[in-house]
Amino acid sequence: MKLFLYHFTFIVYYFIISFSYAFSIKQEIIVSSHNASSILNTTAFWFVEFTESKYDKEEFSVIWNEVSMEFPDIRRAKVFCDLDLEFCAQQEIYDHPKVVVLKNGMWMRHVLEKNQITTKSARQFVKSHLGNCDLEQAENETDCFSDDGEYNSDSSSTDPAFELKEDQSWKHSSILRPLETLNFKRFLFGNEIMSKTRAFVMFVSLKHCEDCFHWEAVWSSITRNTDERLKMAQVNCDEEKEMCNHFHIKKFPTFRVFQGFDSIQYNGPLKYQQLLSYSNQVASYQAIKIEEGDIESIENSHPVFFLVLYDFATTSEDFSIIERLKLQLAGVAPLYICNSKALANKYGAQSQPSIIAVRNGMPIVYQAITPREFRDYKRITEWINIVSSPFITELTPTKCHSLLNRKLTVLTLLQPDSEQFFSSQEELLRLGKRWFRFQMQRQRNDIVWSRIKKYSAIAEAKKKGFARKVKRIKYSKISHPTYTESVSFLWLDSSLWLDWIVENLDHTVYVDSITPPVFVIDHSKGVIYVSDRNGNSLTLEEDSLFSTLRIILEHPNSSRLQKLRAPGLCPNGSPNYRNRYKLIVFNLLIALLILSILTIISASRLSRRRRQLLNKQPVFGFYHSLVIAKSD
């Protein structure tokens, strides 16, 4: 009986001690959007663990729970970001698990990351935020408790429970500007930096790029000198592989401009001044509303500009696509908006809203039959890439890839210090405009021919009495293809391109000639045309040049050509994948042919050997040809 009372007393005492210890520990609360005010609107400080439900029993959570139980008076909270992603995004928490300290409703910079978690580091992290204990004391394992086991605090009840320097990183500074660091979840779900403004993002990879660590300092300098209306950010592709694969980032560093979920890649030179100039252009680019009388001065001051004409019936969906076009046109050409019927008649816009590109005073109207085609963002961007350059421009290494985007390029060698320079430029511009009119007339003829075929088919169906066929053809739509250009007109300074000219052309003929020389390059085939069909050198004479261009486009093998001996006009040009694939297919066919020949030779030798074995067998009739008789 005494033994039973002894055991019963021990169990009761054990439960009393356990319950008293358990109730002395402040319970951890689960925080979400509906009860976030319980910690955000208090003056106390909290140790908040941001994690996911699948991480709740992993090493980080286990160590943090064990260490936090050693400090029963601290306030603990937990947020499951996979269950409440919006709340974590609002608090700018995108990487977890981690522990963040909340002081007076503000998040502190000193956090406990997943890669830092050990029992010692977690204990130091807690001690550095308690009482009079600072981080140095915590790292030296100095005890932060008084002799009676309570936290040592000389401050009053109204003072904060710990002393830390104020976090200044969030404050605005005109000298230092913070650089955003993005990850894929922040891009998809926490899109607050890209929803209302543009963002210029650098993609780097320290594993695949040897000099990318230099670019981090350069990018920080560009960030400080860029207009604050443009957000600046960077992405480390070693950690954010999913985001880099989403945007097909293969080279480093790569720069992209974002506006919402639209993006465009920067293809200019990777130089500090050019990147800084482009970033400021993107930051300040806006559509300018003009009046009818302003158009003349705009035509005289801009070789290329874009004009949007609208009326009272223009919808918000139409204006939204115009807003998205700013991303494509930033740093390329100005964008103007006007409500004028007179300008619509001047530029040949038959309906509103209309998008018009004006190059050297000549308009090109974006052809859209239905509202859906007008709001087709991909179709408009393809059209902008074609019409965003003037009819003639100088070929420079920095703009080389963007200018050589046609099938054929007409290049004229000019010397800026010669007397014929300006007259030759005007003649080349006249040829460019004439060729543009020729292309536009050809496209109109194609549309007219399509209409003739449609009406002829309707008449034929009516004649045969096919009512259903007549109805089907009548309501079929005649497609207006997107405007394309097959020829670009460029001029280059012969002194700057001297090495390329010597490598590919006759130096004496093409540099010392009084008449500006002209030649045509086909980039897809890597060939150059220096003469017409009759063997005469190409010049700026319209009939000869245009007839040569038409012959090359329709019958490319009928004109005299020579192969380009240099890799191409553009330095470090992109490889010609078409020729590369041709070479791969050719090598594969050669390999298959060789394999077939070897197979035939092996089969013939094997059959010959079998015939020889058959001839050596006994000639008796009861012996099989494959049986070898063994005799003693």
From Swiss-Prot:
Molecular functions per Gene Ontology: protein disulfide isomerase activity; protein-disulfide reductase activity
Keyword annotations of the record: Chaperone, Disulfide bond, Endoplasmic reticulum, Glycoprotein, Isomerase, Membrane, Redox-active center, Signal, Transmembrane, Transmembrane helix
Catalytic activity field: Catalyzes the rearrangement of -S-S- bonds in proteins
Main location as per UniProt: endoplasmic reticulum
Signal sequence extent: 1-22
InterPro entries hit by this protein: Thioredoxin-like_sf, Thioredoxin_domain
Disulfide bonds: 209-212
Record-annotated membrane-spanning stretches: 583-603
Keyword Lyase carried by entry: no
Record-linked CDD domains: PDI_a_family
Subcellular location: Endoplasmic reticulum membrane
Residue ranges of every copy of the Thioredoxin domain listed in the record: 153-284
UniProt record, GO biological process: ERAD pathway; polyamine metabolic process; response to endoplasmic reticulum stress
Membrane topology annotation: Single-pass membrane protein
EC number: 5.3.4.1
Top-rank lineage group of the source organism: Eukaryota
GO CC annotation, single: endoplasmic reticulum membrane
Positions glycosylated per UniProt: 35, 41, 140, 557
Function: Acts as a membrane-bound chaperone in endoplasmic reticulum quality control. Probably facilitates presentation of substrate to membrane-bound components of the degradation machinery.
Assigned protein family: Belongs to the protein disulfide isomerase family.
Protein name per UniProt: Thioredoxin domain-containing protein C959.05c
Species the sequence originates in: Schizosaccharomyces pombe (strain 972 / ATCC 24843) (Fission yeast)
